């Protein structure tokens, strides 16, 4: 039973981490729908490691080529690379806000923000934000010509994804589009920005909830991570291809309906 449960968590986490619909919200709501225990923020953060590994694997050529073109990873030329500077700048807001949340919200897993009502309202609000982002014009910014302030704004939007229902990819892609980014590069930067933010979330949860992790069965958890990895690869490939030519419309409609259905079932 543990294996099936963790495979279930892995599939939901992997698909919804990168498709802009909120992985945390779907883990909670779909778990309730199928009568499976809500994994909570700690387990959710740990199985997200599979998603981080998927980003590395999918963009391995881009990452390694960038590293090779800027000498070795510990040399100054590496840190002068624009994309790595942008990722660093974009990660600062979630580190600050995430740290504040950890300090002052002692039981975030059971807070109002993880309630079904909050998830529903946030999902509906995000559908409106994504709609505005999708219809915005002048998409001329890309990974090569973007400004560091663009990275900061996208990073600030990512910090709000701490709230279940926001969606890290939904928030970052929307902010990028509103800032004038090209659709494909908006999604690509969102995924690359997820490497440090998701990794840090998993690390912090591990350190602060180490006693809780000792209760998780190792083999089912490992299977869950593998499942997350492969489902994340599918989601990344799908979203990059879909968004570049179709935009966010299907996800906007889905999020609106998702939020309304939750409210109707409260």
Swiss-Prot record:
Disulfide bonds: none annotated. The keyword ATP-binding does not apply. InterPro entries: UppP. Its main location: membrane. It is a multi-pass membrane protein. It catalyses: di-trans,octa-cis-undecaprenyl diphosphate + H2O = di-trans,octa-cis-undecaprenyl phosphate + phosphate + H(+). GO terms for cellular component: plasma membrane. One of its GO terms (molecular function) is undecaprenyl-diphosphatase activity. Its EC number is 3.6.1.27. Keywords: Antibiotic resistance, Cell inner membrane, Cell membrane, Cell shape, Cell wall biogenesis/degradation, Hydrolase, Membrane, Peptidoglycan synthesis, Transmembrane, Transmembrane helix. The keyword Cell membrane applies. GO terms for biological process: cell wall organization; peptidoglycan biosynthetic process; regulation of cell shape; response to antibiotic. It is found in: Cell inner membrane. It comes from the Bacteria. The chain crosses the membrane at residues 1-21, 39-59, 86-106, 117-137, 153-173, 190-210, 216-236, 246-266. Belongs to the UppP family. Bacitracin is thought to be involved in the inhibition of peptidoglycan synthesis by sequestering undecaprenyl diphosphate, thereby reducing the pool of lipid carrier available. Catalyzes the dephosphorylation of undecaprenyl diphosphate (UPP). Confers resistance to bacitracin. PANTHER family: UNDECAPRENYL-DIPHOSPHATASE. This is Undecaprenyl-diphosphatase. It comes from Prochlorococcus marinus (strain MIT 9515). The lineage of its organism: Bacteria, Bacillati, Cyanobacteriota, Cyanophyceae, Synechococcales.
